Amino acid sequence: MSIGSEVMPSLNPSFTPINWEQATPDTLLERIAEAKIVGMGGAGFPTAEKIALAQKHPPNFVIANGMETDPGVNADKVLLERHLDDVLTGLRIVAKILSAVQSFVAIAHERTVQDAQSLLIDNETVRYLKPTFQNGAERELIQILTGHVVKDNSFPAFDGCLVLNVHTLFAIAEAIAGKPLTKRLVTVNDETRWIDIGTPVEEILESRDPIRVGCYATGKRPRANEVLTAKVNAISNDKSVRALPCIHCGWCDEACPRELPVESLFVLAEQLKPNLDVQDALNRCNDCGACVIACPSNIHLLDHVRALRQRNDTERERISRATQARIRFDAREQRLRSDAMSSDAKRSERMQQQHKWQ
Protein backbone atom coordinates (compact mmCIF):
# COMPACT_ATOMS: atom_id res chain seq x y z
CA MET A 1 0.00 0.00 0.00
CA SER A 2 1.75 3.17 -1.17
CA ILE A 3 2.23 6.25 0.93
CA GLY A 4 3.60 8.79 -1.50
CA SER A 5 4.12 12.52 -1.60
CA GLU A 6 2.73 13.20 -5.07
CA VAL A 7 0.68 10.14 -6.03
CA MET A 8 -2.63 11.32 -7.46
CA PRO A 9 -5.91 9.36 -7.64
CA SER A 10 -5.99 7.20 -10.76
CA LEU A 11 -8.71 6.78 -13.38
CA ASN A 12 -11.34 4.19 -12.49
CA PRO A 13 -12.48 2.17 -15.53
CA SER A 14 -15.98 1.98 -14.03
CA PHE A 15 -16.22 5.80 -13.92
CA THR A 16 -16.87 7.47 -17.26
CA PRO A 17 -15.71 11.10 -17.32
CA ILE A 18 -18.61 13.55 -17.44
CA ASN A 19 -18.69 16.93 -19.17
CA TRP A 20 -20.09 18.79 -16.19
CA GLU A 21 -20.92 21.93 -18.14
CA GLN A 22 -23.31 19.96 -20.36
CA ALA A 23 -24.56 17.40 -17.82
CA THR A 24 -27.81 17.79 -15.88
CA PRO A 25 -27.77 18.50 -12.13
CA ASP A 26 -29.28 15.05 -11.49
CA THR A 27 -26.47 13.36 -13.43
CA LEU A 28 -23.82 15.26 -11.48
CA LEU A 29 -25.45 14.55 -8.12
CA GLU A 30 -25.78 10.88 -9.01
CA ARG A 31 -22.04 10.66 -9.74
CA ILE A 32 -21.19 12.32 -6.43
CA ALA A 33 -23.35 9.75 -4.64
CA GLU A 34 -21.87 6.91 -6.68
CA ALA A 35 -18.36 8.04 -5.74
CA LYS A 36 -19.35 7.88 -2.04
CA ILE A 37 -17.84 11.29 -1.35
CA VAL A 38 -18.19 12.46 2.25
CA GLY A 39 -17.35 15.68 4.06
CA MET A 40 -13.56 15.75 4.23
CA GLY A 41 -13.27 18.60 6.70
CA GLY A 42 -14.04 16.35 9.66
CA ALA A 43 -17.79 15.72 9.63
CA GLY A 44 -17.85 12.78 7.22
CA PHE A 45 -21.51 13.35 6.23
CA PRO A 46 -22.42 12.01 2.74
CA THR A 47 -21.92 14.96 0.40
CA ALA A 48 -24.64 13.99 -2.08
CA GLU A 49 -27.21 14.00 0.74
CA LYS A 50 -26.00 17.38 1.97
CA ILE A 51 -26.29 18.88 -1.53
CA ALA A 52 -29.72 17.29 -2.07
CA LEU A 53 -30.93 18.82 1.20
CA ALA A 54 -29.74 22.27 0.11
CA GLN A 55 -31.55 21.81 -3.23
CA LYS A 56 -34.85 21.87 -1.36
CA HIS A 57 -34.18 25.31 0.14
CA PRO A 58 -33.23 27.83 -2.57
CA PRO A 59 -31.81 30.38 -3.16
CA ASN A 60 -28.43 28.92 -2.43
CA PHE A 61 -25.02 30.20 -1.44
CA VAL A 62 -22.08 27.80 -1.80
CA ILE A 63 -18.96 28.28 0.30
CA ALA A 64 -15.61 26.57 -0.30
CA ASN A 65 -14.08 26.27 3.16
CA GLY A 66 -10.31 26.56 2.99
CA MET A 67 -10.04 27.89 6.54
CA GLU A 68 -7.62 25.39 7.98
CA THR A 69 -7.50 26.36 11.65
CA ASP A 70 -6.11 23.18 13.21
CA PRO A 71 -2.62 24.06 14.53
CA GLY A 72 0.17 22.52 12.48
CA VAL A 73 -2.13 21.10 9.79
CA ASN A 74 -1.43 22.13 6.17
CA ALA A 75 -3.45 19.63 4.12
CA ASP A 76 -5.92 22.21 2.77
CA LYS A 77 -3.15 24.77 2.21
CA VAL A 78 -1.10 22.32 0.14
CA LEU A 79 -4.16 21.25 -1.84
CA LEU A 80 -5.04 24.85 -2.69
CA GLU A 81 -1.47 25.62 -3.70
CA ARG A 82 -1.26 22.64 -6.06
CA HIS A 83 -4.84 22.05 -7.22
CA LEU A 84 -6.69 25.36 -6.86
CA ASP A 85 -8.20 25.04 -10.34
CA ASP A 86 -9.68 21.63 -9.48
CA VAL A 87 -11.17 22.98 -6.25
CA LEU A 88 -12.81 25.82 -8.18
CA THR A 89 -14.13 23.30 -10.70
CA GLY A 90 -15.70 21.33 -7.85
CA LEU A 91 -17.23 24.55 -6.52
CA ARG A 92 -18.74 25.34 -9.93
CA ILE A 93 -20.14 21.82 -10.26
CA VAL A 94 -21.95 22.19 -6.93
CA ALA A 95 -23.10 25.70 -7.87
CA LYS A 96 -24.59 24.30 -11.07
CA ILE A 97 -26.43 21.54 -9.20
CA LEU A 98 -27.96 24.11 -6.85
CA SER A 99 -28.37 26.96 -9.35
CA ALA A 100 -26.51 28.96 -6.72
CA VAL A 101 -26.83 32.74 -6.73
CA GLN A 102 -23.35 33.28 -5.26
CA SER A 103 -20.22 31.23 -4.53
CA PHE A 104 -17.57 32.10 -1.97
CA VAL A 105 -14.04 30.82 -1.40
CA ALA A 106 -12.69 31.36 2.14
CA ILE A 107 -8.91 31.04 2.37
CA ALA A 108 -6.50 31.61 5.24
CA HIS A 109 -3.41 32.18 3.06
CA GLU A 110 -2.96 35.54 1.31
CA ARG A 111 -0.85 34.23 -1.56
CA THR A 112 -3.47 31.64 -2.48
CA VAL A 113 -6.13 34.37 -2.39
CA GLN A 114 -4.19 36.30 -5.02
CA ASP A 115 -3.92 33.17 -7.18
CA ALA A 116 -7.65 32.50 -6.84
CA GLN A 117 -8.67 36.03 -7.80
CA SER A 118 -7.22 35.56 -11.28
CA LEU A 119 -9.31 32.39 -11.80
CA LEU A 120 -12.71 33.63 -10.62
CA ILE A 121 -15.75 33.95 -12.88
CA ASP A 122 -19.07 35.76 -12.42
CA ASN A 123 -20.84 35.31 -9.07
CA GLU A 124 -17.66 34.05 -7.38
CA THR A 125 -15.88 35.83 -4.53
CA VAL A 126 -12.69 34.92 -2.70
CA ARG A 127 -12.04 36.21 0.82
CA TYR A 128 -8.95 36.12 2.98
CA LEU A 129 -9.80 35.46 6.63
CA LYS A 130 -7.47 35.19 9.57
CA PRO A 131 -6.98 31.55 10.60
CA THR A 132 -8.62 31.89 14.01
CA PHE A 133 -10.25 28.94 15.74
CA GLN A 134 -13.73 30.29 15.00
CA ASN A 135 -13.35 31.47 11.41
CA GLY A 136 -13.27 27.90 10.12
CA ALA A 137 -16.53 26.95 11.83
CA GLU A 138 -19.46 26.49 9.45
CA ARG A 139 -21.96 28.88 11.06
CA GLU A 140 -19.40 31.60 11.74
CA LEU A 141 -18.17 31.36 8.14
CA ILE A 142 -21.70 31.78 6.80
CA GLN A 143 -22.25 34.87 8.94
CA ILE A 144 -18.93 36.44 7.91
CA LEU A 145 -19.42 35.86 4.18
CA THR A 146 -23.18 36.29 3.72
CA GLY A 147 -24.26 38.20 6.82
CA HIS A 148 -26.84 35.50 7.54
CA VAL A 149 -27.13 34.04 11.04
CA VAL A 150 -28.08 30.37 11.20
CA LYS A 151 -30.18 29.65 14.27
CA ASP A 152 -28.88 27.13 16.79
CA ASN A 153 -31.87 24.84 16.22
CA SER A 154 -31.53 24.91 12.43
CA PHE A 155 -29.14 23.64 9.75
CA PRO A 156 -27.34 25.86 7.20
CA ALA A 157 -28.87 23.90 4.32
CA PHE A 158 -32.35 24.85 5.56
CA ASP A 159 -31.34 28.48 5.08
CA GLY A 160 -29.98 27.93 1.58
CA CYS A 161 -26.32 27.86 2.65
CA LEU A 162 -23.97 25.03 1.76
CA VAL A 163 -20.42 24.88 3.13
CA LEU A 164 -18.03 22.28 1.73
CA ASN A 165 -14.38 21.73 2.57
CA VAL A 166 -11.94 22.32 -0.29
CA HIS A 167 -10.88 18.66 -0.16
CA THR A 168 -14.51 17.66 -0.68
CA LEU A 169 -14.78 19.96 -3.71
CA PHE A 170 -11.55 18.53 -5.11
CA ALA A 171 -12.95 15.01 -4.70
CA ILE A 172 -16.12 16.09 -6.54
CA ALA A 173 -14.11 17.43 -9.47
CA GLU A 174 -12.09 14.22 -9.56
CA ALA A 175 -15.20 12.02 -9.49
CA ILE A 176 -16.80 13.94 -12.37
CA ALA A 177 -13.52 13.50 -14.27
CA GLY A 178 -13.73 9.73 -13.71
CA LYS A 179 -11.44 9.37 -10.70
CA PRO A 180 -12.74 7.81 -7.47
CA LEU A 181 -11.92 8.92 -3.94
CA THR A 182 -8.99 6.67 -3.00
CA LYS A 183 -6.44 9.06 -1.44
CA ARG A 184 -6.28 12.32 0.42
CA LEU A 185 -3.66 14.78 1.61
CA VAL A 186 -2.75 14.25 5.26
CA THR A 187 -0.39 16.23 7.48
CA VAL A 188 1.81 13.81 9.40
CA ASN A 189 3.86 15.69 12.00
CA ASP A 190 4.23 18.81 9.80
CA GLU A 191 4.76 16.85 6.55
CA THR A 192 1.81 16.77 4.15
CA ARG A 193 1.50 13.94 1.63
CA TRP A 194 -1.01 11.81 -0.30
CA ILE A 195 -2.01 8.68 1.63
CA ASP A 196 -4.30 5.83 0.64
CA ILE A 197 -7.65 5.84 2.39
CA GLY A 198 -7.82 2.61 4.37
CA THR A 199 -4.17 2.66 5.46
CA PRO A 200 -3.79 1.59 9.13
CA VAL A 201 -3.00 4.73 11.10
CA GLU A 202 -0.25 2.93 13.00
CA GLU A 203 1.58 2.52 9.67
CA ILE A 204 1.26 6.18 8.77
CA LEU A 205 3.11 7.44 11.84
CA GLU A 206 5.43 4.93 13.44
CA SER A 207 6.10 6.32 16.89
CA ARG A 208 6.96 5.02 20.31
CA ASP A 209 4.67 7.66 21.78
CA PRO A 210 0.88 7.44 21.49
CA ILE A 211 -0.62 9.14 18.45
CA ARG A 212 -3.80 11.04 17.66
CA VAL A 213 -6.02 10.81 14.61
CA GLY A 214 -6.30 14.46 13.63
CA CYS A 215 -4.16 17.31 14.89
CA TYR A 216 -2.94 17.20 18.47
CA ALA A 217 -5.42 19.84 19.68
CA THR A 218 -8.62 18.27 18.34
CA GLY A 219 -7.66 14.72 17.40
CA LYS A 220 -8.60 11.56 19.23
CA ARG A 221 -6.60 8.52 20.20
CA PRO A 222 -7.04 5.77 17.61
CA ARG A 223 -9.16 2.72 18.20
CA ALA A 224 -7.64 -0.73 17.76
CA ASN A 225 -6.85 -1.39 14.09
CA GLU A 226 -8.21 2.01 13.05
CA VAL A 227 -7.60 2.99 9.43
CA LEU A 228 -7.42 6.33 7.64
CA THR A 229 -10.80 7.63 6.49
CA ALA A 230 -11.61 10.42 4.05
CA LYS A 231 -12.39 12.90 6.84
CA VAL A 232 -8.99 12.67 8.59
CA ASN A 233 -6.63 15.53 7.72
CA ALA A 234 -3.77 14.78 10.12
CA ILE A 235 -1.97 12.18 12.22
CA SER A 236 -0.04 13.59 15.17
CA ASN A 237 2.04 12.65 18.18
CA ASP A 238 0.19 12.86 21.49
CA LYS A 239 1.87 15.41 23.76
CA SER A 240 -0.63 14.82 26.57
CA VAL A 241 1.35 11.77 27.70
CA ARG A 242 3.71 14.34 29.28
CA ALA A 243 0.90 16.27 30.98
CA LEU A 244 1.54 17.94 34.34
CA PRO A 245 -0.99 18.81 37.07
CA CYS A 246 -3.29 21.77 36.49
CA ILE A 247 -1.85 24.99 37.99
CA HIS A 248 -5.21 26.84 37.74
CA CYS A 249 -3.70 29.63 35.67
CA GLY A 250 -6.96 30.30 33.82
CA TRP A 251 -5.30 30.44 30.39
CA CYS A 252 -7.79 27.93 29.01
CA ASP A 253 -10.71 30.18 29.98
CA GLU A 254 -9.03 33.16 28.32
CA ALA A 255 -8.25 31.20 25.15
CA CYS A 256 -11.79 29.86 24.64
CA PRO A 257 -13.39 31.82 21.77
CA ARG A 258 -16.84 31.07 23.20
CA GLU A 259 -15.90 32.24 26.70
CA LEU A 260 -16.72 28.91 28.33
CA PRO A 261 -15.59 28.02 31.88
CA VAL A 262 -13.07 25.46 30.64
CA GLU A 263 -11.20 25.08 33.93
CA SER A 264 -14.46 24.43 35.80
CA LEU A 265 -15.48 21.86 33.20
CA PHE A 266 -12.09 20.17 33.63
CA VAL A 267 -12.53 20.02 37.43
CA LEU A 268 -15.99 18.51 37.02
CA ALA A 269 -14.74 16.03 34.42
CA GLU A 270 -12.07 14.79 36.82
CA GLN A 271 -14.84 13.74 39.22
CA LEU A 272 -15.70 11.01 36.68
CA LYS A 273 -19.45 11.48 37.04
CA PRO A 274 -22.12 13.30 35.03
CA ASN A 275 -23.10 16.87 35.77
CA LEU A 276 -26.16 18.07 33.87
CA ASP A 277 -25.88 21.59 35.31
CA VAL A 278 -23.14 22.41 32.78
CA GLN A 279 -24.85 20.82 29.76
CA ASP A 280 -25.42 24.20 28.09
CA ALA A 281 -21.69 24.95 28.17
CA LEU A 282 -20.88 21.49 26.82
CA ASN A 283 -23.34 22.02 23.97
CA ARG A 284 -21.81 25.38 23.09
CA CYS A 285 -18.29 23.94 22.91
CA ASN A 286 -17.41 23.27 19.26
CA ASP A 287 -14.25 21.27 20.00
CA CYS A 288 -11.92 23.88 18.47
CA GLY A 289 -9.01 22.89 20.73
CA ALA A 290 -7.95 26.43 21.66
CA CYS A 291 -7.86 25.43 25.33
CA VAL A 292 -5.52 22.53 24.56
CA ILE A 293 -3.02 24.80 22.82
CA ALA A 294 -3.16 27.33 25.65
CA CYS A 295 -2.58 24.86 28.50
CA PRO A 296 1.00 25.17 29.86
CA SER A 297 0.64 21.78 31.57
CA ASN A 298 -0.02 19.92 28.29
CA ILE A 299 -3.39 18.73 29.62
CA HIS A 300 -5.65 17.67 26.77
CA LEU A 301 -8.63 19.58 28.13
CA LEU A 302 -10.79 18.68 25.14
CA ASP A 303 -10.50 15.00 26.06
CA HIS A 304 -11.96 15.81 29.47
CA VAL A 305 -14.72 17.99 28.01
CA ARG A 306 -15.65 15.22 25.58
CA ALA A 307 -15.62 12.64 28.38
CA LEU A 308 -17.92 14.78 30.54
CA ARG A 309 -20.21 15.32 27.55
CA GLN A 310 -20.33 11.56 26.96
CA ARG A 311 -21.13 10.87 30.62
CA ASN A 312 -23.92 13.44 30.46
CA ASP A 313 -25.27 11.84 27.28
CA THR A 314 -25.28 8.47 29.03
CA GLU A 315 -26.97 9.97 32.09
CA ARG A 316 -29.66 11.67 30.01
CA GLU A 317 -30.29 8.41 28.20
CA ARG A 318 -30.55 6.61 31.56
CA ILE A 319 -33.01 9.23 32.84
CA SER A 320 -35.02 9.01 29.62
CA ARG A 321 -35.21 5.21 29.85
CA ALA A 322 -36.17 5.41 33.53
CA THR A 323 -38.85 8.00 32.76
CA GLN A 324 -40.28 5.90 29.95
CA ALA A 325 -40.20 2.82 32.18
CA ARG A 326 -42.05 4.74 34.92
CA ILE A 327 -44.65 5.92 32.40
CA ARG A 328 -45.17 2.35 31.20
CA PHE A 329 -45.37 1.09 34.80
CA ASP A 330 -47.92 3.76 35.79
CA ALA A 331 -49.96 3.02 32.67
CA ARG A 332 -49.91 -0.70 33.51
CA GLU A 333 -50.95 -0.03 37.10
CA GLN A 334 -53.77 2.21 35.89
CA ARG A 335 -54.88 -0.45 33.43
CA LEU A 336 -54.85 -3.14 36.13
CA ARG A 337 -56.85 -0.91 38.49
CA SER A 338 -59.31 -0.13 35.72
CA ASP A 339 -59.63 -3.83 34.87
CA ALA A 340 -60.14 -4.69 38.55
CA MET A 341 -62.82 -2.02 38.96
CA SER A 342 -64.52 -3.19 35.78
CA SER A 343 -64.40 -6.78 37.01
CA ASP A 344 -65.84 -5.81 40.40
CA ALA A 345 -68.62 -3.82 38.73
CA LYS A 346 -69.52 -6.72 36.47
CA ARG A 347 -69.51 -9.13 39.42
CA SER A 348 -71.78 -6.83 41.40
CA GLU A 349 -74.09 -6.49 38.40
CA ARG A 350 -74.31 -10.25 38.02
CA MET A 351 -75.09 -10.69 41.71
CA GLN A 352 -78.01 -8.26 41.45
CA GLN A 353 -79.54 -9.91 38.40
CA GLN A 354 -82.80 -11.96 38.78
CA HIS A 355 -81.93 -15.52 37.83
CA LYS A 356 -84.45 -18.02 36.35
CA TRP A 357 -84.08 -20.46 39.21
CA GLN A 358 -84.94 -17.91 41.84
Across the structure, where does each feature detected by a protein language model lie?
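Ferredoxin-type iron-sulfur electron-transfer modules in oxidoreductases and energy-metabolism complexes
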Residues: 235-243, 251-253, 257-335
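Conserved phosphate/anionic-ligand binding catalytic regions in large, soluble enzymes, centered on
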Residues: 34-52
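A glycine- and small/hydrophobic-rich beta-loop-beta segment
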Residues: 212-247, 251, 280
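Mobile "lid/hinge" segments at catalytic clefts and subdomain interfaces of large enzymes
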Residues: 52, 56, 67-68, 171-174
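Short, glycine-rich nucleotide/cofactor-binding loops
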Residues: 76-85
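Hydrophobic alpha-helical positions that pack around
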Residues: 60, 99-201, 205-209, 215
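Gly-rich Lys/Arg/Thr-decorated short loops/hinges at beta-loop-alpha junctions or inter-strand turns
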Residues: 62-76
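Iron-sulfur (Fe-S) cluster-binding modules
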Residues: 1-39, 56-57, 61, 85, ...
